[in-house]
Swiss-Prot record:
CDD domains reported for this sequence: RRF
SUPFAM superfamilies assigned: Ribosome recycling factor, RRF (SSF55194)
Organism: Azoarcus sp. (strain BH72)
Keywords, in A-Z order: Cytoplasm, Protein biosynthesis
InterPro entries: Ribosome_recyc_fac, Ribosome_recyc_fac_dom, RRF_sf
Alphabetized Pfam families for the sequence: RRF
GO CC field: cytosol
Annotated S-S bridges: none
Name of the protein in question: Ribosome-recycling factor
Family: Belongs to the RRF family.
Residues in coiled coil: none
Length: 185
């Protein structure tokens, strides 16, 4: 029972880390990367699909993404979807390919994005701490039901605290990397 609780708690904490990585990947730095457009949805014959299902996304250079649709009539829809996404990008339709230049970030915008990164990190830390609280509550309930001893509870709480510390440290590391990425010119 205790090992199952630890395992499920660790899996949930890992999901929090994965969600943070996904959220951080959406935050635009000055450098282009193909994952930046992953969440852009395009209308394709009446249904909304991810952009990577209707186009090939490549890097043209360090500051430009190239989007080549598989069907030429989709160029306009893909261009509109990129323009309408919340990344502040201005795509240029070149006839065969859509060029998406990455505008340079201003100092003020970098600071704003750093605040957003910290906020995302704090949300992830709160999620990890809530998982710790839930696990500890399960342990207390098990002691109350006399399923486990108090010694097992204390040992398990220590293990869960170590897990929490490990994942909070990983969150801090991810945040530091993203902030450093944002501040590079």
């Amino acid at each position: 029972m205790i090992s199952d609780l630890k395992k499920t708690t660790e899996q949930k904490m890992q999901k929090s880390i994965d969600a943070l990585k996904t959220d951080l990947a959406k935050i635009r730095t000055g450098r282009a990367h193909t994952g930046l457009l992953d969440h852009v949805m395009v209308e394709y014959y009446g249904s909304m699909v991810p952009i990577n299902q209707v186009a090939n996304i490549t890097l043209i250079d360090a500051r430009t993404i190239g989007v080549q649709t598989w069907e030429k009539p989709m160029l306009g829809k893909v261009e509109k979807a990129i323009r309408d996404c919340d990344l502040g990008l201005n795509p240029a339709n070149m006839g065969e390919i859509i060029r998406v230049p990455m505008p340079a970030l201003t100092e003020e915008r970098r600071r704003d994005l750093t605040k957003v990164v910290r906020q995302e990190g704090e949300t992830a830390k709160v999620a990890v701490r809530n998982l710790r609280r839930d696990a500890n509550q399960h342990l207390k309930d098990a002691v109350k039901d006399k399923t486990i001893s108090e010694d097992d509870e204390r040992r398990s709480q220590d293990d869960i605290q170590k897990l929490t510390d490990k994942y909070v440290a990983e969150i801090d590391k991810l945040l530091a990397q993203k902030e450093q990425e944002l501040m590079q010119i």
